[in-house]
A protein has these predicted regions:
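Sec-dependent signal peptide recognition
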Residues: 2-7
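Central antiparallel beta-sheet cores of small beta-barrel/beta-sandwich binding domains
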Residues: 28-96, 129-130, 137-208
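Structural microenvironment flanking redox-active thiols in thiol-disulfide oxidoreductases
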Residues: 291-337, 348-355
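N-terminal "domain-start" segment that seeds a small globular fold
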Residues: 232-269
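Structural micro-motif
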Residues: 337-341, 357-371
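C-terminal motif of bacterial Sec signal peptides marking the signal peptidase cleavage site
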Residues: 14-15
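Thiol-/selenol-based redox modules, centered on thioredoxin-like
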Residues: 366-412
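Short active-site neighborhood of thiol/selenol oxidoreductases, capturing the structured segment around
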Residues: 266-292, 296, 310
Length: 412
């Protein structure tokens, strides 16, 4: 059957099984700390910690990524299975209960395809993500990095890390966004880092060779690439304000896309006239876009009455299915209780197709990309990518800078 049964429908089906299902489930699995492992390859495992909790008759889970705690309220426990549907993203775990100590099954990420899955195991154990030993090098600080060196897909990055004994946290910044909350350990000459947030399933492994750390980056079970990095306090990337721009012959942005109810919305609509308008090019499947959306929610609540409008243009991974695109974006809007409008720009996230929808731009290089328009309708800044809370002080400086910029535009 091509159509995946949603967790909501599944919940209704299981509810019909009656009280026996609930009581059996309670004896099979207990609340507490668990360790999940995603089998990315025959040798590489991505581990992370999960807390399973029960409030009255409602189960919930908390996924831990360094300083990030992801609360999951769509958790269904049956006589022999555990289902965990991730918030916002179109993904879930389906796990069979093998004993009180172990479950097995898979993680499904439907935004990557109806059949995309990663084998998964869940253990009743609270332990560190990685085996640790005495570290033989210090990773604390900034690192100049290159991924897919000398290959067609080569791109630069900056690693920013903090180290306490053998424990490491931090992230990589790229010109399209950061790799969010990474957590791991230095074990002798080796480094291991991981992140799981319901969309990203990232694993980094490497070892020091002289002054260079060389390793491999895995994203789920569909992608891997080599990387190297050297410590460099001055490591930097190109300015995010220089990458996306208006093509020659254009002086304005224009568009008309349907909102979640199907009503066409255009930048030329009366409601956007004499307003500062922030255009957010994004997707509901994108963790960096989620980080940005959480910040934009704060900005909208703070500045809307002063004349700020925010409009999100969603490019969805829904395989051309407009209805699915609308449902996925509506899920994001509902979960975050967002008040600014979201438009379906395309039911596909292909960047070339996205650029065709906005032909005045040189390219769509990243989800997200943000366009700042003043009260006269002139583009004042275009910011490519987003470095979120996982980047620490870099994110705080960005937020301070752009809040000042918005206030300047509102005052003009």
């Amino acid at each position: 059957m091509k159509k995946i049964i949603s967790l909501t429908i599944l919940s209704l089906m299981l509810a019909c099984a009656g009280e026996k299902t609930t009581s059996m489930a309670q004896t099979e699995l207990a609340a507490g700390e668990y360790r999940l492992e995603l089998q990315l390859t025959s040798e590489q495992t991505l581990p992370f910690e999960l807390s399973l909790q029960k409030d009255a008759d409602q189960w919930r889970a908390i996924i831990h990524n360094a300083a990030e705690n992801i609360e999951v309220d769509e958790v269904l426990l049956t006589a022999d299975s555990l289902f965990i549907r991730m918030p916002v993203f179109d993904s879930e775990f389906r796990l069979a209960i093998e004993s009180e100590q172990q479950l097995s099954g898979a993680f499904y990420n439907y935004s990557r395809g109806l059949d995309y899955q990663i084998p998964a195991k869940m253990f009743a154990a609270a332990q560190a993500r990685f085996t640790t030993a005495q570290p033989n090098f210090e990773i604390d600080g900034n690192w100049e990095a290159v991924f897919s060196d000398e290959l067609e897909d080569e791109y630069p990055a900056v690693g920013v890390f903090k180290q306490e004994a053998d424990y490491v946290s931090g992230t990589f910044l790229t010109e399209t966004g950061d790799y969010r909350f990474l957590e791991g350990a230095v074990n002798g000459d080796k480094l291991q880092l991981a992140c799981f947030d319901g969309a990203h399933a990232f694993l980094f492994e490497g070892a020091m060779e002289g002054d260079t750390l060389r390793g491999t980056f895995w994203s789920g079970n569909h992608w891997q690439e080599p990387f190297w990095m050297v410590k460099n306090p001055e490591a930097s990337l190109r300015s995010p304000e220089e990458l996306t721009y208006l093509k020659e012959g254009y002086d304005k942005l224009s568009f008309s896309f349907p909102d979640l109810a199907g009503k066409p919305v255009s930048l030329s609509d009366q409601g956007f006239q004499d307003k500062v308008v922030l255009i957010q090019i994004m997707g509901s499947w994108c963790p960096n876009c989620l980080d940005e959306t959480q910040l934009y929610k704060q900005w909208y609540e703070r500045y809307h009455e002063q004349g700020l409008e925010i409009v999100a243009l969603a490019f969805e991974r829904s395989r051309g299915d407009l209805g699915l695109a609308q449902r996925n974006v509506q899920r994001l809007v509902d979960k975050l209780e967002l008040a600014y409008p979201f438009l379906i720009a395309n039911a596909d996230n292909d960047k070339a197709a996205a650029a065709a929808k906005l032909p005045m731009l040189n390219a769509i290089l990243s989800y997200p990309t943000s366009i700042y328009i003043d009260r006269k309708g002139e583009i004042r800044r275009i910011h490519t990518g987003f470095n979120g809370p996982g980047t620490g002080d870099i994110y705080l400086r960005y937020r301070e800078d752009y809040e000042g910029f918005i206030e300047k535009l509102l005052a003009e």
